[in-house]
């Protein structure tokens, strides 16, 4: 490494840092093979899939010196030196520089290298501003902020008090934040920080990656961080119903001879692509394989709009789509005419004609998702061969685990807990996060061969179980790699819970000078803290029935952060089920507001789910110890 950096000028180092930041989509400080693959896809480089894989494999083989499946900035610098004279480097640099509409700003964060540049997309900013303006135009709490001007930097200033972010989170995942916990009037720097903590910890709880974002970054309106977080929040809302268990009409997208189980493994992006192609096939038009290169001429969109527009009758009054714009010779004008037709359906959000013609994949994906949510135009087939038992949605516990993993920035994103863990890649990433070393040379990585691919995944799962038993010292009695690969829910959850538990306890051990923390220590600390604050509540275990009132949690928050809890919001006597739920909603939101990263749901407190209850008290203990320090 020493030798390779001596020949790099400061200017070149800055250029490389900028390139690295563009590829490092999740801001993890590392670039994974998935991010490299995404880069080629996003750049709309007309390369066949095998060529992309070849280049990615070459890059990893050259750059990944410690074989951990990802590239650090130092490894990236070495790589670019090594590839300088080769064709692959030219291709690679061409892709990085191909991202247009990019505004570069100097890096100011204390963790960013001196002189780095973070870039953000002007198009994304405009699209998000217009979407938020429309979504919150009638919210009285946002009157002082909305409408924002899409053509200046008002977005970054308007998000600085945390109110808009909290509102957007609730739009994407209703009831995530208890509105009573949002500070709305006479804001001070402290109450603004509380709002931003509430937004960040709530975003984390719905599966957004927030590992490198702090309240101060949002307060300062750092564009690349703000836009990255906003996109994640908006995407959660756009994709909420693109899920077969929540929208059975999607079964209509089954291909000839395909099992429902296979369709259920598809990500929302893949389902959207299939939905578009379903309608294009019905229109007699050729199918597409992406939301960038293939939609640039707008013609597929014209046919899609014509297929999904109401025809009268049950769908409501007919809306006629004018297809004459297909014959327009100018791409930009054709895209403009197409968006005029989309506007008839009330769905021209997210893209401008230029975004369509440039093939902006993120904004075109959002445009299509919004079309799907408004006019899916699918009818559930009357097919008796389909096993409807498969359509049971995920449990609240499964969703919590999935959101926890995604919030930590695992790659790939987990859409379906069991099928997306079938190759154990994400489990290995979680092991690393709980400080269980993974020997990446033992791990098979995608793309898996068509023949024997599942064996490669099972080998990974066997290694994951072996690490759990021998290195992490988990209790994994009766669990084999095949159970993970097949998505055995009970056994997979047993491993995932132990990963989450260890992660939570590690945070506490770090605060307590490394001493091992267990349930007894947490319970003892909770009771001592409650007693020293003269509270009447206490808990005997994480199964204590009094937890269903949420009063021990609220009293503990008050002991740790006096004045955070507004006592008039709490019911203490003769609690109905509704009162208990309201207390729980308030408790979870106020805990997040004081900085506790809690993934549990209000129902976990009301129903006294001991595992999730433990994580709530552990996170609050972490917050309490942090304050003392």
Curated annotation (Swiss-Prot):
InterPro entries: Actinin_actin-bd_CS, CH_dom, CH_dom_sf, EF-hand-dom_pair, EF_Hand_1_Ca_BS, EF_hand_dom, Fimbrin/Plastin
Sequence positions bearing N-acetylmethionine: 1
Actin-binding 2: region residues: 381-625
Chain positions covered by the region annotation Actin-binding 1: 108-380
Primary location group: cytoplasm
The Calponin-homology (CH) domain, residue ranges: 122-238, 266-376, 395-504, 516-625
Positions annotated to bind Ca(2+) 2: 64, 66, 68, 70, 75
EF-hand domain sequence ranges: 11-46, 51-86
BP-aspect Gene Ontology terms: actin filament bundle assembly; actin filament network formation; auditory receptor cell stereocilium organization; intestinal D-glucose absorption; positive regulation of multicellular organism growth; positive regulation of protein localization to plasma membrane; regulation of microvillus length; terminal web assembly
GO CC annotation: actin filament; actin filament bundle; brush border; cytoplasm; cytosol; extracellular exosome; plasma membrane; stereocilium
Highest taxon of the lineage: Eukaryota
Binding, Ca(2+) 1: 24, 26, 28, 30, 35
Keywords tagged on the record: Acetylation, Actin-binding, Calcium, Cell projection, Cytoplasm, Deafness, Disease variant, Metal-binding, Non-syndromic deafness, Phosphoprotein, Repeat
Intracellular or extracellular location(s): Cytoplasm; Cell projection, Stereocilium
Post-translational note: Phosphorylated.
Record GO terms (molecular function): actin filament binding; calcium ion binding; structural constituent of cytoskeleton
Tissue spec. comment: In small intestine, colon, and kidney; relatively lower levels of expression are detected in the lung and stomach.
Disease cited in the entry: Deafness, autosomal dominant, 76: A form of non-syndromic deafness characterized by mild to profound sensorineural hearing loss and variable age at onset. Sensorineural hearing loss results from damage to the neural receptors of the inner ear, the nerve pathways to the brain, or the area of the brain that receives sound information.
Function of the molecule: Actin-bundling protein. In the inner ear, it is required for stereocilia formation. Mediates liquid packing of actin filaments that is necessary for stereocilia to grow to their proper dimensions.
Subunit-structure text: Monomer.
Record's protein name: Plastin-1
Gene label: PLS1
């Amino acid at each position: 490494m020493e030798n390779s950096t001596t020949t790099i000028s400061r200017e070149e180092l800055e250029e490389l840092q900028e390139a690295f930041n563009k590829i490092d989509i999740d801001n993890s400080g590392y670039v994974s093979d998935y991010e490299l693959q995404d880069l080629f896809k996003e750049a709309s480089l007309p390369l066949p899939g095998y060529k992309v894989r070849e280049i990615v494999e070459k890059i990893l083989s050259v750059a990944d010196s410690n074989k951990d499946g990802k590239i650090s900035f130092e490894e990236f610098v070495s790589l670019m030196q090594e590839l300088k004279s080769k064709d692959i480097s030219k291709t690679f640099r061409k892709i990085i520089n191909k991202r247009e509409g990019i505004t570069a700003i100097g890096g100011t964060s204390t963790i960013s290298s001196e002189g780095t540049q973070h870039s953000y997309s002007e198009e994304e900013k405009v699209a998000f501003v217009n979407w938020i303006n429309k979504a919150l135009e009638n919210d009285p709490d946002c009157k002082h902020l909305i409408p924002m001007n899409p053509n200046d930097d008002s977005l970054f200033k308007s998000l600085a008090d945390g109110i808009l972010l909290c509102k957007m989170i609730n739009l994407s995942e209703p009831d995530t934040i208890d509105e009573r916990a949002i500070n709305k009037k006479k804001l001070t720097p402290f109450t603004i920080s509380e709002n931003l903590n509430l937004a960040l910890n709530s975003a984390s709880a719905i599966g957004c990656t927030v590992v490198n974002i702090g309240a101060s970054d949002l307060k300062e309106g750092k564009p690349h961080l703000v836009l990255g977080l906003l996109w994640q929040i908006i995407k959660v809302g756009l994709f909420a119903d693109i899920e077969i268990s929540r929208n059975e009409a999607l079964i209509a997208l089954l291909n000839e001879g395909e099992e429902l189980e296979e369709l259920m493994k598809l990500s929302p992006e893949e389902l959207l692509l299939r939905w578009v192609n379903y309608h294009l096939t019905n229109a007699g038009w050729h199918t597409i394989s992406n939301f960038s290169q293939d939609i640039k001429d707008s013609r597929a969109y014209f046919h899609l709009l014509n297929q999904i527009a109401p025809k009268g009758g049950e769908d409501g009054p007919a809306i006629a789509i004018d297809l004459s714009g297909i014959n327009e010779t100018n791409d930009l004008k054709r895209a403009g005419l197409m968006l005029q037709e989309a506007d008839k359906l009330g769905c021209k959000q997210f893209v401008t004609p230029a975004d369509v013609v440039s093939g902006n994949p993120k904004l075109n994906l959002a445009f299509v998702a919004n079309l799907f949510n408004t006019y899916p135009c699918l009818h559930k087939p009357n097919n008796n061969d389909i096993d409807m038992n498969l359509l049971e949605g995920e449990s609240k516990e499964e969703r919590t685990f999935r959101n926890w993993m995604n919030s930590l920035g695992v790659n790939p994103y987990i859409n379906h807990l069991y099928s997306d863990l079938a190759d154990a890649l994400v489990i290995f990433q979680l092991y690393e996060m709980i400080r269980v070393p993974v020997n990446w040379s033992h791990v098979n990585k995608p793309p898996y061969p068509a023949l024997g691919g599942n064996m490669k995944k099972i080998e990974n799962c066997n290694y994951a179980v072996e690490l759990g038993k021998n290195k992490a010292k988990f209790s994994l009695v009766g669990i084999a790699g095949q159970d993970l690969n097949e998505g055995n829910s009970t056994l997979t959850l047993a491993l995932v819970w132990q990963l989450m538990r260890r992660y939570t306890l590690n945070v506490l051990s770090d605060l307590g000078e490394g001493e091992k923390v267990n349930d007894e220590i947490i319970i003892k600390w909770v009771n001592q803290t409650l007693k020293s604050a003269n509270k009447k509540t206490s808990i005997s275990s994480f199964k204590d029935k009094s937890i269903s009132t949420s009063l021990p949690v609220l009293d503990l928050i008050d002991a740790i952060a006096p004045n955070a809890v507004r006592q008039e919001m709490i019911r203490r006597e003769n609690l109905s089920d509704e009162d208990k739920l309201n207390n729980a909603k308030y408790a979870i939101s106020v805990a997040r507001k004081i900085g506790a990263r809690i993934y549990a749901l209000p129902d976990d407190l009301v129903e006294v789910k001991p595992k999730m209850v433990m994580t709530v008290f552990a996170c609050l203990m972490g917050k309490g110890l942090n304050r003392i320090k």
